[in-house]
Amino acid sequence: MLRYSVLSSQTRLLSVSRQRTATQLLASNRITTGKRYYADPKNVQPTSPTPVSPESKSVIPPETVNSVTTTPTTQVQTSPPSSIQPPQPPVENPSTGSVPPPPPKRKGRFRRFLLYLILTSGIAYGGGVFAALKSDNFHDFFTEYVPYGEEAVLYFEERDFYRRFPNATRHSNRLPPIHKEESQRVTIPSKSGLSWKVAEEESDSGSLTQKGPHNSAVSASKDTTGAKAVTKAKEERAEKKAPAKKEAPAPAPQEETRTPAITPPTTLELVKVEHADEPVVQEVVRIFNDIITVISADEGAASKYAAPISRVRTELESIGEKIVSLRAEAQKAAKEEIEKAHALFDESAKKLMQQIETARAAEAAQFREEFEAEREKLSRAYQDKIQTELARAQELAEQRLKNELVEQAIELNRKYLNDVKELVERERDGRLSKISELTANVNQLEKLTTDWSDVIETNLKTQQLQVAVDAVRSVLENAASAKPFVRELVAVKELAADDPVVAAAIASINPTAYQRGIPTTSQIIDRFRRVAGEVRKASLLPEDAGIASHAASFVLSKVMFKRDAVTDGNDVESVLVRTENLLEEGNLDAAAREMNTLQGWAKILSKDWLADVRRVLEVKQALEVMETEARLQCLRVES
């Protein structure tokens, strides 16, 4: 724009200068032509009237004719003749001689503005897409507020995914075909009278390593199909019996008491891949969840595509686990490479010892991995066995309850028929008033049956809550290292959704504790011993310590004797000795209180250790509150 403005200003200046030059030349020409020398004849103005034009006959006076005269032909030429004609001076209009011509109009301003706007918008949009691919926070902002931002980011993420995984589309044809004839059949399964919600909650309270509704949606779809079939069969049966009721109104058996208390859901379970930090995995999970949501909107499609969706869900979860394991292996390999690179720059005297320690650490890591793999295998087998036993026991209990309810219903029907017969016989004698008493008795029996069903359901929920709390405690007690217990805690929260005490206990736990796990007692003791050495060194330093003071503190901390465990002093050494004894006794609360009495650098150095102990104590206290609440619910049910 600046360049075009400079050119336009230069054009204006040149046009004005040219106009002034032409005016000056014309004036000088007039002056030279108006001069008369003594040898020249006098210019005489014509006296005859001058016509305005050859075609018009009107005349004008001589005063209105321009005084421009021609040069006399007798003038002597002072320069050699030239073949180049001199430039003709521009003829100036008397009315507009002093007004400069208008400046040329600027053309293409709107086109340039539109071009720059498009280029700037394209560069900004491309930069936004690039930043959204790199930053999660900007990704959320860009896809939510920028038009077509989500489609653009999704397009580039898909291209990146297919570039990194070119063989990802090979597994698309592994799903078995679904026969339409089987999906259109209406069958009543053997367990159609049971509620699907109880089985799902019980599967959530078990082990996380086994297969269940949290890993596949097949069972949920089967239960949903069975419940829909039962509902449809009952509706057809009711339509067939409707004409008969109009003709002869007879008391029908109470079959409505056996219908499920909770209607089966028509939506499929969404995919939840744990530890899916990769954006590609997150995008695939989001797309698959959108597909599930669309399928769940249609009841027929939800039951039809339940099996393929469950298989795809299992594949996605296995892919997420593989990505997590690959990333962990890559981090471990990178860490080992860094340690080896640092080991090369150490002193030559320590090189042999470091190599020996590295080899020993590698062997220990290998043995530890083998031990962990074997322990995990045994734990998985044991959990599968326990889960199988629990499932069998639950099935037996439910079948027993179902049989008892059926027997009670049959007995009630038999009694009802007998009472009806007796009333019909007594009706002849004029005792129709007994019918109201019989109806009241039947209502009382129905109410009693309903109350017992509620008591049984409450008892089952209480038992499931107790099992879920025990699962959380077993994860914390049996873990050899810090292990997350998010799924167990989610199971407890789902089972105790209506209990404010359990919800408050779960909310009091620090999210870092159940996301990353809490350290075990042995880890706390080992870390305390390392922290105690640093605290002893810091306790010998004055406030303005120098290099000599640090060296003296290091030497004195090596030769300093430990005090007896029964000391009552408030110095750093006494506090450390008492804390170590309390940790060996298993009293973490008292040990944390002892370490909290330290002051200065000693307390600053032990701050992280105190934070870990505080998280462990908070988790244990929350578990105790949840166990107490579960026992209280059991007592309420029994009372």
Curated annotation (Swiss-Prot):
Bias (Basic and acidic residues): 232-248
Keywords of this entry: Coiled coil, Membrane, Mitochondrion, Mitochondrion inner membrane, Transit peptide, Transmembrane, Transmembrane helix
Residue stretches in coiled coil: 309-447
Transmembrane helix listed as a keyword: yes
Role according to the record: Component of the MICOS complex, a large protein complex of the mitochondrial inner membrane that plays crucial roles in the maintenance of crista junctions, inner membrane architecture, and formation of contact sites to the outer membrane. Plays a role in keeping cristae membranes connected to the inner boundary membrane. Also promotes protein import via the mitochondrial intermembrane space assembly (MIA) pathway.
Gene designation per UniProt: MIC60
Example of a GO biological process term: cristae formation
TM regions (residue ranges): 113-133
Cellular component, GO, one term: MICOS complex
Start and end residues of each stretch annotated as Disordered: 34-106, 168-264
Compositionally biased tracts (Pro residues): 83-92
Annotated Polar residues bias: 205-224
Biased composition (Low complexity): 61-82
Range of the transit peptide: 1-38
Compartments reported by the entry: Mitochondrion inner membrane
Organism phylogeny: Eukaryota, Fungi, Dikarya, Ascomycota, Pezizomycotina
Topological region Mitochondrial matrix: 39-112
Broad class of the protein's primary localization: mitochondrion
Family: Belongs to the MICOS complex subunit Mic60 family.
Mitochondrial intermembrane topological segments: 134-639
Membrane topology per record: Single-pass membrane protein
Assembly description: Component of the mitochondrial contact site and cristae organizing system (MICOS) complex.
Stored InterPro entries: MIC60
Protein name: MICOS complex subunit MIC60
